């Protein structure tokens, strides 16, 4: 196919959009691939749509290879199924809700687990109908509180979601592995660096869960890897729990005056002054920091939550929110302290915490706070701390929560070496739903013994529109976009640079022959200067370009590789063959 730029609906911009936060957003707008309509809502222009369609084609090919069948559900959905599964409440403000003219609750679909489950329930009733895998590629809607980074975090986005249905766990395991293998093939074809990491299931529920992250320095997600193969989103890291220590013989707890010790640093300094240790100095790791949050639940209730962790660590609020999802974590305000006078700001200790204590504040501790560990912590009195407070002897928390920050060099939970931090953009998420939705919606089939059994499900999602941004983010440079060949809107761009009909005629001939050979070709036949055409070619980012210009008088054209920057001259007679060889290998 041959497209002429003189007829293409595109306008490149010389200035960055005012709201651009990341390179992909900047270049996709400047190159004329997308345009902002509202916060988190974008129109797709011809070039952007071509990239997205090529990604969709890859997804369809790989889904077909494992026997998945494509369907399409509406975006406008009835609320009743989401109320039955609890997600009408769980999704909270992230759900786009509306009423029809009769006052009936409706929503714009954020995901379609309920719809897939009900359709299979309506049509299938026997184990002979399974296994089954269905998928769709469709627009989704989530009312993001802070849409940002262009199409990386929008309120409308395109997603491929697939669902597997099996009679037993063994079938689900096979379906999960087939999807995982298909995702690996898809991501290998998309042409950017990615990592597969252990993940949380979130409000979807389920057990085994993995994310496919595009590695990007400014990605929203932090993940860890070890040299021994461990990989996980930090939200899913569960550190190894130390063994309990013996309590016998430990010193008794002692309340010590610690004037103005409202920070860990000042507390450690005072501890080393007033109660120096014989073996080593006190450090922040010897202190027990108790941090209080307010947790807002989807049903509108709010409760305080205290978290105890070693003082040299901070609570990672993203990890905390992942554990408590769908609840939302809020700061504990001065008004909250006033309503809970037992909590002395800066000096909170286990003595005032716990559901069995007067405050009734739920108290969860870091896994490192095991029985027999001794701590310096708040005495619930201003300017006073308790030394030698022993877990399991002097206090008992309500439970354990692993939400402390993960640091570079921390040991991997599986003992496979040190953890190394990196950042990425979540593009895919696959997990085993199990029977959560089938139970809620009554999806059962008769097994081979004639007994009704609940179907077990898997869920597999890939952000198609987000993949466009992730690829752009991972491959662009200071000049513009730089598309991998398999997703580029065009295989080749041919530029006619110079005056006179001879140059344009030769450029048109080369472009036409390449198109006849089966390539997608963009011909820059505009009446613009060579400088403008070269700049636009860099911004648009086609993997290969052919420049027909002043070298034509010597029988030469220039072939450029956008990713490597390599330029080489070839004869006019060899141009088409040279380009075909480069494109097809």
UniProtKB/Swiss-Prot annotation:
SUPFAM superfamilies linked: Class II aaRS ABD-related, Class II aaRS and biotin synthetases, YbaK/ProRS associated domain
Molecular function, one GO term: proline-tRNA ligase activity
InterPro entries: aa-tRNA-synt_IIb (IPR002314), aa-tRNA-synth_II (IPR006195), aa-tRNA-synth_II/BPL/LPL (IPR045864), Anticodon-bd (IPR004154), Anticodon-bd_dom_sf (IPR036621), Pro-tRNA-ligase_IIa (IPR002316), Pro-tRNA-synth_IIa_bac-type (IPR004500), Pro-tRNA-Synthase_IIa_type1 (IPR023717)
One Gene Ontology cellular component annotation held by this UniProt entry: cytosol
GO biological process, alphabetically ordered: prolyl-tRNA aminoacylation
Record remark on domains: Consists of three domains: the N-terminal catalytic domain, the editing domain and the C-terminal anticodon-binding domain.
Binding partners and assembly: Homodimer.
Family of this protein: Belongs to the class-II aminoacyl-tRNA synthetase family. ProS type 1 subfamily.
Protein name: Proline--tRNA ligase
Species of provenance: Cutibacterium acnes (strain DSM 16379 / KPA171202) (Propionibacterium acnes)
